[in-house]
Amino acid sequence: MTELHQIVKRMLVTEKSTLEKDEKNKYYFEVDRRANKIEIRKAVERLLKVTVDDVHVINIKGKKKRTGRIIGKRRDWKKAVVTLAQGNTIDIYHGV
């Protein structure tokens, strides 16, 4: 994986992630399913110009969804919880 924007797809902003950001300096990202912790760490450090302390990865199975008699499935995806070094922050509301 060479493209940094292919590894880190988007930042996840939820109620839980906002609390973790304020209390523990943790940020949540949706990442490529093939990416490993080392690639995620390097991508976040280069894209956002911060120092990463720790990376936790969670594989999330897609839910089964039903419309009438047709049963479908949402895609599987990977979530990364990135802990930044003390003193580093990411301004997620910049320009809003």
UniProtKB/Swiss-Prot annotation:
Which domain of life does the UniProt lineage start with? Bacteria
Known SUPFAM superfamilies for this protein? Answer: Ribosomal proteins S24e, L23 and L15e
GO molecular-function term, one example from the UniProt record: rRNA binding
Signal peptide feature range? none
- Listed GO biological process terms: translation
A Pfam entry, by short name: Ribosomal_L23
What are the entry keywords?
A: Ribonucleoprotein, Ribosomal protein, RNA-binding, rRNA-binding
Claim: rRNA-binding is one of the keywords in the record: yes
Query: Is Oxidoreductase among the key words of this record?
Result: no
A GO cellular component term found in this entry reads: ribosome
The family annotation for this protein states: Belongs to the universal ribosomal protein uL23 family.
The record's listing under HAMAP family reads:
Ribosomal_uL23_B
Q: State the function annotated in the UniProt record.
A: One of the early assembly proteins it binds 23S rRNA. One of the proteins that surrounds the polypeptide exit tunnel on the outside of the ribosome. Forms the main docking site for trigger factor binding to the ribosome.
On assembly, the entry states: Part of the 50S ribosomal subunit. Contacts protein L29, and trigger factor when it is bound to the ribosome.
Protein name per the record: Large ribosomal subunit protein uL23
Report the source organism. Answer: Syntrophus aciditrophicus (strain SB)
